[in-house]
Amino acid sequence: MKTTHTKNLIAAALAAALAFTAVIARAADPLPSWNDTAPKKVIVAFVERVTKEGSPDFVPPAERIATFDNNGTLWAEQPMYFQFLFAMDRIKALAPQHPEWKTKEPFKSVLAGDMKGLLASGEKGLLEIMARTHAGMSTAEFDQIVREWFKTARHPRFKRPYNEMVYQPMLELLAYVRANGFKTFIVSGGGVEFMRAFAPDAYRIPPDQIVGSMGKLKYELRNGKPVLIKLPEVLFIDDKAGKPEGIQSFIGQRPIFAFGNSDGDQQMLEWTAAGRGARFMGLVHHTDAEREWAYDRKSDVGKLDKAWDEAVAKGWTVVSMKDDWATIFPPTK
């Protein structure tokens, strides 16, 4: 009897010890939502090389610049970029004041819920929607409208607030590189004012470290108070070749670490790779149709084609969501 009891105690103690060891190991792992595959190993090895004093690849903290695309890299982008879904909701809200929209594209497609028709309108149609829904209000008014939208809007598939559609592995990566002296920036084709309304809370990246597309602003006095009014004119598009241009214009330093997910990020990765010393270039490849989506070369949103070919040819890191991420989204709040 005593022998059986003793064995049970030993078994329980071993189980507790193993569980405790697992907890300690997880706590010590800076990237617990990443599987122990090649991309994770490459990332950790790179960070250790550039932060270890005496290493031939050591980079001073002031030069540890990391840039991240947003759509499809830090958060989801299907069935359409979330800022466009916001703009579509604004079109529907404003439609009673504009009966002409029922017969005029791209507004007709928006009101009919015709996603294919909207995409067929191309960049011109999407920019027109953005201009009509964003312009005329102050930056403070726009910020408030965006914040209110995030409180009520839900993703059609996952039924979660859009600002919860962020990738847990990338949240961990942001925290990891910051803990190692990196300064993290968003460099995205999304609207800078839209991103500034949610990104500081979602990613712990302050507004002054967010580079994005932007429209023109106009200074005015309204009711005796100075305001900045959003105009229906594009000032800068932070996509493709615009990304390295934006990095130089608004950051002033070439990154040593850059992550994207589509052909729109190709030039940012090329610009990063062209610098001297150790460099990391990464792409998120959407390969998990069950937990997220699977798309690449033929997608209307987040197309990954030429950048993928270049990544393979040059040995950049390509992260497969299905194979390399143990978790996609954070737990629901």
Language-model features, listed with the residues they occupy:
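A metal-dependent, Asp-based hydrolase signature
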Residues: 80, 85-164, 168
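N-terminal secretory signal peptides that target proteins for export/translocation
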Residues: 1-7
